[in-house]
């Protein structure tokens, strides 16, 4: 290998060590919901792939990532929110990524309800951590 090739190989190897750590997938999403009519705020834990009902909304988190502790804190969730009203076809209100650190970046735009991501966690590790 010539000198230039060696320099490129070393530079590439060093750049890999500077990349941020990959986010860890989690199995549970922590959401907060707001009913704007009653001003009631609720915190809900939803397993990924499970649908919950909040008012007329059906909320289904599809994927949840949480950055490792050595990185800047961030939880990101791919979520689908469908509104089901009586005598109407279900309407997709939101489908996309929501970020715990920036709730306004990709928010649900609904006149009655707000939904935002608080965190992601693994239910199995949480049970172990809380055991005395």
Task: Specify the residue positions occupied by each region the protein language model found.
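N- and C-terminal low-complexity/disordered segments
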Residues: 2-5, 19-132
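Bacterial N-terminal signal peptides
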Residues: 9-17
